[in-house]
Amino acid sequence: MSYDRAITVFSPDGHLFQVEYAQEAVKKGSTAVGVRGKEIVVLGVEKKSVAKLQDERTVRKICALDENVFMAFAGLTADARIVINRARVECQSHRLTVEDPVTVEYITRYIASLKQRYTQSNGRRPFGISALIVGFDFDGTPRLYQTDPSGTYHAWKANAIGRGAKSVREFLEKHYTDEAIETDDLTIKLVIKALLEVVQSGGKNIELAVMRRDQPLKILNPEEIERYVAEIEKEKEENEKKKQKKTT
């Protein structure tokens, strides 16, 4: 029997191959990074270069689900569009029903449940996306969650998904400290530094979104990102000069 054709059938060694193939599709997607700061949440995405005549505003990997929640994804954009639309409807329904915005965990659990149903239904295939979902609960607590095609989800302080996730995660494990997220600017710089591990052409290929407590989502413009990149490069040069002085 060909176990990789049937979505609902386990292989003898316990694999659901279609779910694993969906996870491989995620690994081919653009790198996305999320970091939870003290008063801020930041998402950064590697921007792929667009065709000369294409309007780059139509190619977005970061989107708002509600006033207090937004997400970035890696994987198949068309699959993500379905998940995003359903999540937005759920956010609106929740607001109408209980007159409060969703918590970040609530909408993450909804998205994870939606993905899980597609791993257990005949005639369907899993969604080929992973998502980083960030925002603030109504008590002002910053949150960061990650979901994958199997329908599992976890809370994180910082995480990465997509093509360069392994090297970016290693960078974050080394450099994520309380001092590194002490201020909003330092948190933003940490995300940019993490992305620069895999993005070759500097700030022009980075998309960045930030949300501060009690403030709406803000997409940073290219000039702001370039300013942060310039500051990071300057800090690197100064650190290298200090190292050279110590060795001499």
Curated annotation (Swiss-Prot):
GO biological process terms on file: proteasome-mediated ubiquitin-dependent protein catabolic process
Family: Belongs to the peptidase T1A family.
Protein species of origin: Xenopus laevis (African clawed frog)
GO CC terms in record: cytoplasm; nucleus; proteasome core complex; proteasome core complex, alpha-subunit complex
Cited NCBIfam families: PRK03996.1
Protein name: Proteasome subunit alpha type-7-A
Keywords: Cytoplasm, Nucleus, Phosphoprotein, Proteasome
CDD domains the record matches: proteasome_alpha_type_7
